[in-house]
UniProtKB/Swiss-Prot annotation:
Residues annotated with N6-carboxylysine modification: K224
GO molecular function: nickel cation binding; urease activity
Every Urease domain range: 136-572
Organism: Haemophilus influenzae (strain PittEE)
The protein's name in its UniProt record: Urease subunit alpha
Length: 572
């Protein structure tokens, strides 16, 4: 017999459904559920008097020998994903990967159970009815200055770190390069203890090929070209030749001082080959004043770093001091001051906001401890989205913010994965991918996750006093969970490496325990492949006034005095 309940009762019990709108944190962004994959009346819910019990939503006969039985299920959860959209479903996990997005349960007693989403006695259950699930974030601009960065990253919802470095050496303070085979081996061994997925860039600044090849063979998933080592046309050409040969990505921080050429010379050296440009606006470095024009090319995968996101009243002042420290400049030296001033331009920073909203800039990253904050990639992304809604209005005519939300979440999930040849494994919650999942209460969305799941195992979470009688008493703060303890760390995170390194079996050679996964398809991608962020308009920059125009139209916006997801969330 059917039971009719009010919509309010349904939402209170099972969470929102199709047409319901959910506010993201204290932003002005509202996500509307587009599709509900659950069967009404057969929702799975765990707890006293609920449905996930033997003979009801849990099978009384299915063992784990049955490949359709789940290890872990998140029930009734709202999903925000660049590829799946904004939907309601159960998420089924087995062997550390997502095996189903649909209806979990017991097919002996329930209709429409997704075939490979059986709940059995071997299945752990987490109620997601009033939570939002997103894919773990990917930060592709990491200066590996200190290992404690990984903790701050995962606590913010970022589960994959790609970059370079060797610790607090001056070369690492300024550039994201792990130079040479010896350091590559040491850094892989050190990263065994980190609870996140990791990939390292080799130093791409070399005008001959063999010194680049040996770094890739030692495990580098890509090469980083940085102006502090000399971003010359010869260096660019050499790095891209090796990249094409060995199927890895090249990231570049171009020549701010225009010492060896201008933007046009760099683009000529790139010669149509795919490349990932860092802080493409230019405050973080790059051809002054017009590196932002690189975003219009179809072979350029343009990224931002988070210190310029979004444009606020404090952005300019903060950058000048950061720049002096990170690039070893001296305020007493006029040339150093001029160098700093050339990089910090309000006009191009304002344009960067709008280019993100238009889908011209495709990727968000941090520039960790080197002019950026590793724990603020997610926050700054949504602050930018909110600012653009307030200043530019709605995108499209859907009557909701879904398209803008999908555009912005793609910038730190699927698009960096596509850029670096790892989208087969991470970057979205699609079936088959590693179960790196972040769960948020809507009121804390983008700021403070409830639970971070790595490869199907809870790795970090908000946790109260361990001596309390229940899990919630204060002090509540992030603590590593069992997925980030002992030998489990090696089973819940992976290393991304080159195909050459995988063939050479560096896992065995270096004595590593984490799985190594080779990057693939780095050279046949382009801007057209970046989800919701594939726009390639004509961009011009006035060399004297720094004004930015897109297809002839001036683009600019005002800095704001305050942002959402800010101080009110960090009183304690």
């Amino acid at each position: 017999m059917a039971l009719t309940i009010s919509r309010a009762q349904y939402v209170a019990t099972y969470g929102p459904t199709v047409g319901d709108k959910v506010r993201l944190g204290d932003t002005n962004l509202w996500a509307t559920i587009e599709q509900d994959l659950l069967t009404k009346g057969d929702e799975c819910k765990f707890g006293g008097g609920k449905s996930v019990r033997d003979g009801m939503a849990q099978s009384g006969t299915a063992t784990r020998d049955n490949p359709n039985v789940l290890d872990f299920v998140i029930t009734n959860v709202m999903i925000i994903d660049a590829k799946l959209g904004i939907i309601k479903a159960d998420i089924g996990i087995r062997d550390g990967r997502i095996v189903g997005i649909g209806q979990a349960g017991n097919p002996d007693t329930m209709d429409n159970v997704t075939p490979n989403m059986i709940i059995g006695a071997s299945t752990e259950v987490h109620n997601g009815a009033h939570l939002i699930a997103t894919a773990g974030g990917i930060d592709t601009h990491i200066h590996f200055i200190c290992p404690q960065q990984a903790q701050h990253a995962i606590e913010s919802g970022v589960t994959t770190l790609i970059g370079g470095g060797t610790g607090p050496a001056d070369g690492t303070h300024a550039t994201t390069c792990t130079p040479g085979a010896w350091y590559m081996e040491r850094m892989f061994q050190a990263a065994e203890a980190l609870p996140v997925n990791v990939g390292f860039f080799g130093k791409g600044n070399c005008s001959t090929l063999d010194p680049l090849r040996e770094q890739i063979e030692a495990g580098a998933l890509g090469l980083k070209i940085h102006e502090d080592w000399g971003a010359t046309p010869a260096v660019i050409d050499s790095a891209l030749k090796v990249a094409d040969e060995m199927d890895i990505q090249v990231a570049i921080h171009t020549d701010t001082l225009n010492e060896s050429g201008f933007l046009e010379d760099t683009m000529k050296a790139i010669d149509g080959r795919v490349i990932h440009t860092f802080h493409t606006e230019g405050a973080g470095g790059g051809h002054a004043p017009d590196i932002i024009k690189a975003a219009m090319y179809s072979n350029v995968l343009p990224a931002s770093t988070n210190p310029t996101r979004p444009f606020t009243k404090n952005t300019i002042d903060e950058h000048l001091d950061m720049l002096m420290v990170c690039h070893h400049l001296d305020k007493r030296v006029p040339e150093d001051v001029a160098f700093a001033d050339s990089r910090i331009r309000p006009e191009t920073i304002a344009a960067e906001d709008i280019l993100h909203d238009m889908g011209v800039f495709s990727i968000m990253s941090s520039d960790s401890q080197a002019m950026g904050r590793i724990g603020e990639v997610v926050i700054r992304t949504w602050q930018t989205a909110d600012k653009m809604k307030m200043q530019r209005g709605e995108l499209g005519n859907e009557g909701n913010d879904n398209f803008r939300i999908k555009r912005y979440i793609a910038k730190y999930t699927i698009n960096p994965a596509i850029a670096h040849g790892i989208a087969e494994h991470i970057g979205s919650l699609e079936v088959g991918k590693i179960a790196d999942i972040v769960l948020w209460k809507p009121m804390f969305f983008g700021v403070k996750p409830e639970v971070v799941i790595k490869k199907g195992f809870i790795s970090y979470a908000k946790m109260g006093d361990p001596n309390a009688s229940i899990p919630t008493p204060q002090p509540v703060f992030y603590r590593p969970m069992y997925g980030a303890q002992g030998l489990a760390t090696a089973q819940t995170a992976v290393f991304f490496v080159s195909q050459a390194a995988e063939k050479a079996d560096i896992r065995e050679k270096f004595g590593l325990h984490k799985e190594t996964i080779a990057v693939k398809g780095c050279r046949n991608v382009g801007k057209k492949d970046l989800v919701h962020n594939d726009v390639t308009p004509n961009i011009t920059v006035d060399a004297e006034r720094y004004e930015v125009r897109v297809d002839g139209e001036l683009i600019t916006c005002e800095p704001v005095d305050s942002v959402p997801l800010g101080q009110r969330y960090f009183l304690f």
